[in-house]
Amino acid sequence: MLYYLLKYINEVFDPPGLGVIEYLTFRASAAAITALLITLVAGPGFIALLRARFIEPVKEEAPPEHRKKKLPTMGGLLIIISVEVSVLLWAKFTDPHVWLIMLALLWMGVIGFIDDYSKVVLKVKGGLSARWKLVGQISLGLVVGIYTSMDPVFSVLMRETTVPFFKNLTIDYGIFYVPVVIFIITALSNAVNLTDGLDGLAAGSSAIVIFGLGGFAYLAGNVVYASYLSIPFIPGGGEIAVVCMAATMACVGFLWFNANPAEIIMGDTGSLALGSTIAVTALLIKQELLLPVLGGLFFLETLSVSLQVLYFKYTRMRFGEGRRIFLMAPLHHHFQLKGWAEQKIVIRFWIVTILLFLTSLMTLKLR
């Protein structure tokens, strides 16, 4: 809204310096600062409001030190509000790339909110069932997949994607495009949800990954850069960078209150929303196959859970008793039970995510 207002003032009155509103880098920076300020300013009051009623139930299967924590949940609402307001102010929200990402953020945010509300207020053990979460994820995947495959703005590019490390290699999804979209959205939203187990881990890791996607979006939206780097040119895709910067700094602002010792946790409201946002952003800029690199931490966390469950079932069937690969899954709890301090685990996992981000940048030239 502010973008359109300032653009109108610039066109009618032509004040000096206001033409900067047309620069993508300016609006991305403005959106980032706005999102950060909203989270920092609104955070204390928001925490007090949630603490009055929405306290996360303690999980008995959690490591001992986690059983003592009683924190307000649904903090993801603060992230969602910050991003939505910042994007409405600074992005061209008529751009379909923008509102598709905003739809993903809100859609899975609502699913996560229902889950958190069920656990905290309605006292439903386990919250929203996995089946209904899956319905929400599949529904979002269907909407995004069908819309992008039919709308002329997207349909030319969407069914094909590039392969990291290869210059001219593309994959045509064909009739499998919509199922691929559903799988990626479901996988990423669940992966970020699994990662959200230590103070600051999901927020910090998501900020790094979304920042990386924002960089790729900026390059993909510029025909010169896209051609030089042999990545798909996404007309109008540069607006995605504005959204990514807002989401990055909303996570950083949330981290101010979520860093150990946390005052609030994002809950499924935040983790499912951020995961779907990462997935849809990657799909729109045709970098979904880069996610195992850029978002490698999320995949490791998910893989640790899958391996633990499969190995336990196999050994129980083979030997009569279930055995474990890890002391506890997801992976961060394994290191916690090995005696690593929570802060050390989080910072080391951030470092791993930064290294994966740098590796993903290298793929631009290693083709």
Swiss-Prot record:
PROSITE patterns: MRAY_2
UniProt keyword Chaperone, yes or no: no
GO cellular component: plasma membrane
Primary localisation category: membrane
Keyword annotations of the record: Cell cycle, Cell division, Cell inner membrane, Cell membrane, Cell shape, Cell wall biogenesis/degradation, Magnesium, Membrane, Metal-binding, Peptidoglycan synthesis, Transferase, Transmembrane, Transmembrane helix
Cofactor(s) needed by this chain: Mg(2+)
Transmembrane segments: 30-50, 71-91, 94-114, 138-158, 169-189, 200-220, 237-257, 264-284, 289-309, 344-364
Gene Ontology biological process: cell division; cell wall organization; peptidoglycan biosynthetic process; regulation of cell shape
EC class (word): transferase
Pfam families in the record: Glycos_transf_4
Pathway listed: Cell wall biogenesis; peptidoglycan biosynthesis
Similarity remark: Belongs to the glycosyltransferase 4 family. MraY subfamily.
UniProt function note: Catalyzes the initial step of the lipid cycle reactions in the biosynthesis of the cell wall peptidoglycan: transfers peptidoglycan precursor phospho-MurNAc-pentapeptide from UDP-MurNAc-pentapeptide onto the lipid carrier undecaprenyl phosphate, yielding undecaprenyl-pyrophosphoryl-MurNAc-pentapeptide, known as lipid I.
Protein name, UniProt field: Phospho-N-acetylmuramoyl-pentapeptide-transferase
Organism: Chlorobium phaeovibrioides (strain DSM 265 / 1930) (Prosthecochloris vibrioformis (strain DSM 265))
Highest classification ranks of the organism: Bacteria, Pseudomonadati, Chlorobiota, Chlorobiia, Chlorobiales
